[in-house]
Amino acid sequence: MSKVKTRVYCCGGTGMDIGVNLQWHPDLVFIDTCDKNVTADHDLERVFLTEGTRGAGKNRRYMLPIIRPQVPGFLERYPAGDFNIVVFGLGGGSGSTIGPVIVSELAKAGESVAVVCMSGIEATEVLQNDIDTLKTLEGIAAATNTPVVINHIENVNGVPYTELDKEAIFNIHALINLTSQKHVRLDKLDIDNWINFTKKHNQIQPQLCQLHISNNRQEATSVPEPIAIASLFADASREVAFGTPFVRTVGISDVSDPDLLADQLHFVINSIGVASLFGSLTKQKQELEAAQVRYQQRNAIIDIDDNRTDDGFVV
């Protein structure tokens, strides 16, 4: 059986929330550790719940050995596509383990894959998960000798998750469009060599990289030290080369395509931006810890004169 063109794997609570808005794509599926993120809007035929789990409680260390052996069966049920998008949150306990395990399995199998992920900033344990998940993705890149490319949705205090989800939905839609194999001049190997740029340029160290998606050439041009660029143009006469990438590929879209999101789209991969992302999350965690260290431990309201039983009752 031939592969689907673009498979989308939506993992954990973040993946469930984002993916429910993209079910128009026939090759999108969900995986989570409990049913608490499943709503009436989810197509249950696409939902895979891991066995022996009732959520993760943001505990990645607890969850990893439970879900790791279940992912191969999930991938057998929903095989990889020519291109694969893995969607998850960095800061939880389910998606941040399921997602990287899927990425690792796909990378080991030589599949093309990109990640769309969102950080969490609401607690120190969440920020620590963000940090550890990024480190995990860097580790997967080193272990598989393949770059791991993430489109990161930045979580900002005061911005509702619904707004962040909109950015993720647009970016996933854009990636589905890019990898649809329906653009003039853009074939499957062009996409493979763009996302797996170290195949042809082995002087570049495989590591965690960041994918910047924009419908504005000026904005795309501002991405520092671009390694690989893919662009879509609805009007071939507007094609303009920019940046200093190792890899550049271009597709010309059909203006009548209902999936046309903009007259141009640019997908720029670099690695230098990961350092600032990692630094920002680390700084936010340190700021929370600095505030928490000033918390006061109150004195106990029980004292030695209370008539207290061995099991804690005061009578």
From Swiss-Prot:
The non-hydrolyzable GTP analog GMPCPP stabilizes filaments, which never disassemble. Its EC number is 3.6.5.-. GO terms for molecular function: GTP binding; GTPase activity. The record marks D187, D190 as: GTP hydrolysis. GO terms for cellular component: host cell cytoplasm. Pfam families: TubZ_C_2. Transmembrane segments: none annotated. Changing D190A: Complete loss of ability to position viral DNA and capsids in the middle of the host cell. It is found in: Host cytoplasm. It catalyses: GTP + H2O = GDP + phosphate + H(+). The keyword Oxidoreductase does not apply. Its main location: host cell. InterPro entries: PhuZ_C, Tubulin/FtsZ_GTPase_sf. It is an enzyme of class 3 (hydrolase). GTP binds at G13, T14, G93, S94, G95. Keywords: GTP-binding, Host cytoplasm, Hydrolase, Nucleotide-binding. Consists of two domains: a nucleotide-binding N-terminus that hydrolyzes GTP and a C-terminus domain necessary for polymerization. The domains are bridged by a long, central helix. Interactions between the C-terminus and the following monomer drive polymerization. Homomultimer. Polymerizes in a strictly GTP-dependent manner. Belongs to the FtsZ family. PhuZ subfamily. A tubulin-like GTPase that forms filaments, which are required for positioning viral DNA and capsids in the middle of the host cell for optimal replication. The motor component of a partition system which pushes phage DNA (encased by protein gp105) to the center of the bacterial host cell. Also required for movement of phage capsids to the vicinity of the DNA and rotation of the encased viral DNA at midcell. Forms filaments during the lytic phase, which position phage DNA at the center of the bacterial host cell. This is Phage tubulin-like protein.
